[in-house]
């Protein structure tokens, strides 16, 4: 009997030791769950990609490197695109309006979905039968690898949008940028991601993260509204938000490719027109052009805000290495320049994590003209090879990717693929480079597919999703109202120049730079910016059926072409009617699109202002800029009654212009996102600190320490401690928080002597620093951020050692800026006891599973150990009571019964595990007591 009792005691000691180990083991697994899931997801995609890569033939591997365009909407077995997909295993396609890939509205969205379905089905069908491997003449079964289906859809309708029917027409990037509201950028991105992915598109060439540092007023070649603006910080912020929105809207099913890396904002040529040369060094690029790309790669705050790829631009740099006489090749083709760029720390980390580099169109008119100025010797396959070896993973080959000796694009693509396949077999270094890129491509495709295997069903979205496409106009309307900007005059002067809006008796002449486009080659011409657009909006919103502020007989509309005919005295146009109506009008309203030397009629407004002042003298002359806001010079702007920036020509923005004209919407919400020399507006100066503000200073003490949100209180400090100080939000000239990185000087003074100055930079408009208390006495802390030189003063009395109480006084300078004033004084005595911080203990569904698992494990261990001594009945009782005890303990804290919160707070993160284990131990103890009582009776 004694032997049995000793064995039972040993069993009990063993059980106690195991119980102590359970929470430690369980906590280890629990604490790593979130990170492990994310890591396993990325790891799983790469593992599946590696496994698939090892099964591919050389032809299948090199085919994945190419994104091609194709003409038309057919994918039958007689078409070239069918052959490229089936027999040459290309990685993807790019859809373009210029390639006639879309159908006539209103079937555009449905036709696009159908086209993409046929493309992906063709890829799948090719994997259902054997093919002959050309090198070995052996049969093999091609793998089904979903195609990238890409598009460039930059907003504002054509030409920036490839699809401009059936989808929601979204604002231009500059229209979004003028709001300075990242949430709106995110909403626009969400709509774009949702609607494009519903069509089956899984690769977006955008957004543009170019910084329009110095706009070109003549409109000869800059990006205009195709960029968020001219401040690198704000371009990065809006880009991050837009990218996050696209990823959210597509539910992770769309790759976002930022362009035009490393930045096209300083160029004086459009990327599709000519290869531009910019005089900038790498150090200069780091400060301006590269900053937005940093923001969405290595410096992105989340996976949602991180782009999947960068589109490398055909842009050259003079003085890239500091030698002004040295000019790079186009960056997309220059291995040294591109390698230097992508090895900068933010990009290197992003590349290591799977970021993909995509070349700009290797068949573009601009690139062909650069590589082959004579037009006699364009070697497409060697161009593609050089672009790949320069560091691009995917090669975009457009419809003009045609060697001089080849008949068409198809022939050049096939010969290029043959070259790559042969070089893959012959050159181990090239083979390694191909495998590296293909692995990244396959990994991205697995992530987009969100599946461990590629299936046709997971590749093509359901057709019923199309019912939700094109129904998000409210987002564009909201952006239009938040973006509208009064460029000239000031708000004060506007009340004098235009004291009242038009009334029912006023004659109004609307003159519009109308634009048209075709969705496809056989589609009818569409007026995407019609000459009657603004007049129609005015009639709809303020005409006889909407309040009767205007009547149609007093409204007249003309185009810029007609105005140009008047200025040229063209005999084929009866310009006398327009001339007479202008002469009799009280209001002349211009709707200005982009100005370009390629389009003479776009310059009609400038000519009108210079040549016919007699027709607008003593009239209300208003210009709405539906594109970039900098096309008019100072002299031209001085002749206007009002000049507004609208930034987009889509209908929602036209409606907003009408509402502004009639005073329904104030043009006070948006701000110019680029510099405008015509009104002497410099964006960098405008986003610098407002000199009329008084910077607020606070003791930067965490709320949890004080137990109060009042930032002007501080705990006891003594000599040798650090004084934590922060500013309030520092505002720029437009009343918005200054960009991150704005320099703030914190100045520590004693009397009239400056003891120390510390330079810090802002984050979310706020700067922080600390000062070391080295001696007793009275010190004063101020802050300045040029040109804002005034702040309140923190006066702190440091007592001698041994007297811990510190009193400080905040001196507030008078200011007209509307700021929240801190409390004037604050004293923390030694006897004050701060209230306890709020508890961080909480439980959730994961805790329930952990508690149940721990209870079952403990019960099973106790059962096993008890039965090893032959006590099967007591083993069952002990195990069950341990499980019951653990679950009862969990239920006690889950129901928040008295004392449960304190039980969670004391152990911290291990609370649930320890309490559950303790409950199980109590249950086992109860069974042990029961057993002892039973044995003694």
Question: Could you describe each region identified by the protein language model?
Answer:
Residues 34-165, 169, 486-489, 575, ...:
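N-terminal hydrophobic targeting/anchoring segments and the immediately downstream early-domain regions
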Residues 13-32:
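Sec-dependent N-terminal signal peptides of Gram-positive bacterial secreted proteins and lipoproteins
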Residues 57, 77, 108-118, 123-124, ...:
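Second-shell residues forming the walls of enzyme active-site clefts
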Residues 37-82, 86, 352, 371-744, ...:
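Preference for extracellular/luminal or secreted protein segments
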Residues 103-157, 177-200, 204, 233, ...:
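Active-site-adjacent structural elements in enzyme catalytic domains
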Residues 63-70, 91-95, 147-155, 203-207, ...:
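Hydrophobic faces of well-ordered beta-strands that scaffold small-molecule active sites
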Residues 84-111, 205, 296-331, 401, ...:
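Short acidic, glycine-rich surface-loop motifs adjacent to enzyme active sites
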Residues 139-288, 294, 298-305, 312-318, ...:
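Surface-exposed loop and adjacent secondary-structure segments within mature catalytic domains
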